[in-house]
Amino acid sequence: MKTIQLTFLFEDTGFCKDVFQSVNQPYYYCNRDTVDGTWYTSTPDDYQNDCRIRKDVIIEIISDGQVIALDGNGDFEGKKPFIPFYTFREQLAQAFLNKHPGVHSYEDMKQKLLFLPSGGALL
């Protein structure tokens, strides 16, 4: 299997994709569909999906010199898909709501924080 290394460039929520850039020059770009997780090569000027990346390609997502995800269109041992920020944010919010079922609004959250030890110092 071939391995490529990419870094996260930006999230394009309007077109439901995350845009990545290769670690090494010459730079090339790839997109990951945030709905179904499919990877595509991308045009360099406006980041349009070009071709679907082959299933035998492993994509290493690099951040601060570390591999944070192993992803790709195929199935392989050790696959650890990239989690888009909006998904992470939604999962975090849902986990908080599950833990604190009485919190339904910003005002509820503010009241909850005020009753924590030294909660007044937060505001």
Please describe what each predicted stretch is.
Residues 105-109:
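Short, surface-exposed acidic
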Residues 3-12:
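Structural detector for short beta-strands of small beta-barrel domains
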Residues 13-104:
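Acidic, low-complexity, intrinsically disordered interaction modules
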Residues 93-97, 110, 114-117:
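Residue-level detector of alpha-helical secondary structure
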Residues 1-2, 114-123:
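Short intrinsically disordered terminal tails
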